[in-house]
């Protein structure tokens, strides 16, 4: 298996679908073989892939349309489907072993299992799932067993919070904690005030409001780190930035520690086991400094603060699009070796 590239198909060519495609096409250990999206033409798909308001133009190889069913990335053909029902997508025909389910619609096990009928061997849901096992790379991916066919990569915020919470809990113990994420705009929000029956505040104009919102990200940490189950919860503020978000984790510690000791522990882990997942900075950074950062969580040593040696606020940045999309691919690579 060492030399054989892992063949990936993507269902849903939205923000995460397109960025997972970008990540895959820039790596040597994986290969993009198929994309399915019933709502866009092949021509429009190339345009959406080529131009990106946040991450810039695609510059890695020329993108051409071979025919209605095939895109060429340089010389590499990628099959395009436009099928609504996931059961009917012929993944096996295209050679896709792993399917990234990034429509945001088929997030539970039953719905995601439809991809297996078309010949996919494994499905990774790029969203939290109420019943599929959730994995956060750097935290609990070692618990993946090869008989699991449908898994979730959790949420971008859980991917930011969990590595940080793991380090703090392993080193100092967490009694309890509250998280706030100051989160960039996502596709579910509205450009101007509009109807949003499930979340009235969420229907307000995204580009000129700070919008309080719910998030399951902190509670989900308890699913990937059972030791923290019931110890964390949190909420979100949606703010008018297009990408990059920041987690503010306020925790009560079991073991007394100075802020410097906490910084040292996080720095050590960021250079050790969690290298490439958890970052550490002492620079005077702001959100745009992290656009295109492929780490899950970058601890901002200067932004955090301790009230006492057992009560501390920790701040960690994440590119909620690019970092997360990078982890989706990392998880697939990990699964292929299990």
Swiss-Prot record:
GO molecular function: copper ion binding; DNA binding; glyceraldehyde-3-phosphate dehydrogenase (NAD+) (phosphorylating) activity; glyceraldehyde-3-phosphate dehydrogenase (NADP+) (non-phosphorylating) activity; NAD binding; NADP binding; salicylic acid binding
EC number: 1.2.1.12
Sequence positions that bind NAD(+): 15-16, 37, 84, 320
Active site: 156 (nucleophile)
Major location (coarse): cytoplasm
Modified residues (S-glutathionyl cysteine): 156
One GO cellular component, as annotated: mitochondrial envelope
Enzyme class label: oxidoreductase
S-nitrosocysteine: modified positions: 156, 160
Family, similarity comment: Belongs to the glyceraldehyde-3-phosphate dehydrogenase family.
Protein name: Glyceraldehyde-3-phosphate dehydrogenase GAPC1, cytosolic
Gene that encodes the chain: GAPC1
């Amino acid at each position: 298996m060492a030399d054989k590239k892992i063949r990936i198909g993507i269902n849903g060519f939205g923000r995460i679908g397109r960025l997972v495609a970008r990540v895959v096409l820039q790596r040597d250990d994986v290969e993009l073989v198929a994309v399915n999206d019933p709502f866009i033409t092949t021509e429009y798909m190339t345009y959406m892939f080529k131009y990106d308001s946040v991450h810039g133009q695609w510059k890695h190889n020329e993108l051409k349309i071979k025919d209605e069913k095939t895109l060429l990335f340089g010389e590499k053909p990628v099959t395009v489907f436009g099928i609504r029902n996931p059961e009917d997508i012929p993944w096996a025909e295209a050679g896709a072993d792993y399917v990234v389910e990034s429509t945001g619609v088929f997030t539970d096990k039953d719905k995601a299992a439809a991809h297996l009928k078309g010949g996919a061997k494994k499905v990774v849901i790029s969203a939290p799932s109420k019943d599929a096992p959730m994995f956060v790379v750097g935290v609990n991916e070692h618990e993946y067993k090869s008989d699991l066919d449908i898994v979730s990569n959790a949420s971008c915020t859980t991917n930011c919070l969990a590595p940080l919470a793991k380090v703090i809990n392993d080193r100092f113990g967490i009694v309890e904690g509250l998280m706030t994420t100051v989160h960039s705009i996502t596709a579910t929000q509205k450009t101007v005030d509009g109807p949003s029956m499930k979340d009235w505040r969420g229907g307000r104009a995204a580009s000129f409001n700070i919008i309080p919102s719910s998030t399951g990200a902190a509670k989900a940490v308890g699913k990937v780190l059972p030791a923290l189950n019931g110890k964390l919860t949190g909420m979100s503020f949606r703010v008018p930035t297009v990408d990059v978000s920041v987690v503010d984790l306020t925790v009560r510690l079991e073991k007394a520690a100075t802020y410097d000791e906490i910084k040292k522990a996080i720095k050590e882990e960021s250079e050790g086991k969690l290298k490439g997942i958890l970052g550490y900075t002492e620079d005077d950074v702001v959100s745009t400094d992290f656009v295109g950062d492929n780490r899950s969580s970058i601890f901002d040593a200067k932004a955090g603060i301790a009230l006492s040696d057992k009560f501390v606020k920790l701040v960690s940045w994440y590119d909620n699009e690019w970092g997360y999309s990078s982890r989706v691919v990392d998880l697939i690579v990990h699964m292929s070796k299990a």
